[in-house]
């Protein structure tokens, strides 16, 4: 795969071109190669559905407000993790319908693992391309202490305050949409995000959490939705697994 070819070349100093986007986040040739492969493939598969990728997201709201169904792609989620070579980066593909993700695929290039889901049907984890996948579910009840998963590269003072309010907990730091995936397979209880994310960062794994029996909501308890505004930034949100806590109330003091 194009991403792994570039990843292996990172061992050689200067062998991989790295640019900076307008927001100063890194952009590599792996991002662009994966973007081309995925977008071309989806357009060939479903030519009637628009495809929007992080690397080609400059579509006016006046155009996309008419999209009832579209593909939303992050060709390389976790570019900082990719560059640090810790393996915690993913490829995210979601089908969004009426502002909600209804199909999600998260591919982990280093391990070959795939997480995928279909709304109202379920979520699965496949260990390889030859594996048809096994069902995954969120944990039936919360662990004591609570297992919280958080960002490895984007910690914030607001998250620290929120975790302090939770009391006893175990924090696992992780990159990319893998945070949602460990929640979906029952290895964590909650993923609070108090910091910037874009819709392509979350849509695919959002679908997987929901397919596994969890949910993703804003801090006011409203559903996290897609393609609603002129930009692509998400509000702060909570991804939850077990339903044995009033998670919105627990995080209500975050401001």
Predicted feature descriptions by range:
Residues 1-76, 157, 161-164, 222, ...:
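N-terminal subdomain of lithium-sensitive/metallo-dependent phosphomonoesterases centered on the IMPase/IPPase/PAP
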Residues 3, 78-79, 148, 183:
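Buried hydrophobic positions in well-ordered alpha/beta secondary-structure cores of metabolic enzymes
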Residues 67-109:
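Glycine-rich active-site/cofactor-binding loop and its immediate structural neighborhood
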Residues 93-181, 230-255:
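Acidic beta-strand-loop-alpha-helix segment within the catalytic core
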Residues 148, 182-186, 203-210:
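Hydrophobic residues within well-ordered alpha-helices
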Residues 185-190, 214-215:
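Alpha-to-beta junction loops
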Residues 200:
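Acidic donor-binding loop at a coil-to-helix junction in glycosyltransferase catalytic cores
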Residues 211, 215, 219, 223-240:
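Beta-alpha-beta core module
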């Amino acid at each position: 795969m194009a991403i792994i070819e570039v990843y292996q070349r990172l061992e050689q100093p200067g062998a991989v071109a790295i640019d900076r986007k307008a927001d100063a986040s890194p952009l590599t040739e792996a991002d662009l190669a994966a973007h081309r492969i995925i977008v071309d493939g989806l357009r060939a598969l479903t030519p009637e559905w628009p495809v929007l990728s992080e690397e080609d997201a400059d579509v006016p709201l006046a155009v996309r407000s008419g999209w009832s169904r579209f593909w939303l792609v992050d060709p390389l989620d976790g570019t900082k993790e990719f560059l640090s070579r810790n393996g915690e980066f993913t490829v995210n593909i979601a089908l969004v319908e009426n502002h909600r993700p209804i199909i999600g695929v998260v591919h982990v290039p280093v391990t070959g693992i795939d997480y995928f889901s279909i709304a109202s049907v379920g979520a699965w984890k496949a260990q390889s391309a030859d594996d048809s996948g096994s069902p995954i579910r969120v944990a039936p009840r919360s662990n004591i202490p609570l297992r919280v998963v958080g960002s490895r590269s984007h910690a914030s003072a607001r998250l620290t305050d929120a975790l302090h309010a939770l009391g006893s907990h175990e924090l696992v730091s992780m990159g990319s949409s893998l945070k949602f995936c460990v929640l979906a397979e029952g290895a964590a209880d909650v993923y609070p995000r108090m910091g910037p994310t874009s819709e392509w960062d979350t849509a695919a794994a959002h679908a997987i959490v929901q397919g596994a029996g969890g949910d993703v909501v804003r801090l006011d308890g409203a559903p996290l939705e897609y393609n609603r505004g002129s930009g692509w930034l998400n509000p702060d949100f909570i991804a939850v697994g077990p339903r044995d806590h009033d998670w919105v109330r627990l995080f209500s003091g975050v401001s």
